[in-house]
């Protein structure tokens, strides 16, 4: 017979068991060659240009005009702008202050012209992001994002519907950003 203490311990271990679950985007088109898209993605300092874009009223107006109204409200865009302005970029990391505290995404693997792999640092949630690029045509590349998140069963069930949207949201964003020289 198993004692109550042992049963509670086993239940506690089961509840805290974390597994990596992967979520994958659809395939998106980048209007740049595979090499150009990779070059833009592999050095995260290039994303510093986002700060300038969000600070320029003309570019903000252009962004608002080209976003579907049901995706991002002007208020949400202002919130995003505020977050982007606080971000810090190095060649290998993007750091941001979040509601959970400072969080970073760091490049841990680069496979020239094909893959950039990032992992979270200083985050309460372990996550990995794989961005894959494949030549699609003379001046286009195909882009796919896979996000792996390490969560316990109960937390995963609570946030899964939101996490499932993340790869497509990120892939759509990257396909637009990487298309711009």
Model-derived features with residue positions:
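Hydrophobic ligand-binding cavity/cleft-lining segments
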Residues: 2-88
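Short, surface-exposed coil-to-beta transition loops
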Residues: 23-25, 100-105, 125-130
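Residues that cap or initiate secondary-structure elements
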Residues: 34-36, 93, 102, 111-113, ...
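Hydrophobic pocket/interface hotspot
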Residues: 37-41, 47, 107, 118, ...
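Short amphipathic alpha-helical signal-transduction/dimerization elements
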Residues: 45, 163, 167-179
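Glycine-rich portal/gate segments that line the openings of hydrophobic small-molecule binding cavities
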Residues: 61-121, 180
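Beta-strand/loop substructures that line and gate deep hydrophobic ligand-binding cavities in soluble
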Residues: 117-168
């Amino acid at each position: 017979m198993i004692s109550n203490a042992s049963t509670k311990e086993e239940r506690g271990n089961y509840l805290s068991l974390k597994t990596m679950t992967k979520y994958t985007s659809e395939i998106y088109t980048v209007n740049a060659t595979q090499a150009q898209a990779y070059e833009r993605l592999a050095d995260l300092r290039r994303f510093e240009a986002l700060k300038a874009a969000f600070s320029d009223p003309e570019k903000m107006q252009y962004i608002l005009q080209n976003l579907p109204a049901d995706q991002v409200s002007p208020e949400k865009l202002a919130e995003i702008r505020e977050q982007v302005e606080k971000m810090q970029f190095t060649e290998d990391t993007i750091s941001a202050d979040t509601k959970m505290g400072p969080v970073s995404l760091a490049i841990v693997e680069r496979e020239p012209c094909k893959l950039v792999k990032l992992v979270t640092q200083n985050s309460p949630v372990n996550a990995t992001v794989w961005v894959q690029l494949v030549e699609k045509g003379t001046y286009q590349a195909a882009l796919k994002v896979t996000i792996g998140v390490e969560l316990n069963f109960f937390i995963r069930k609570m946030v899964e519907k939101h996490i499932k949207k993340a790869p497509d949201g990120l892939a759509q964003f990257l396909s637009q950003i990487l298309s711009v020289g």
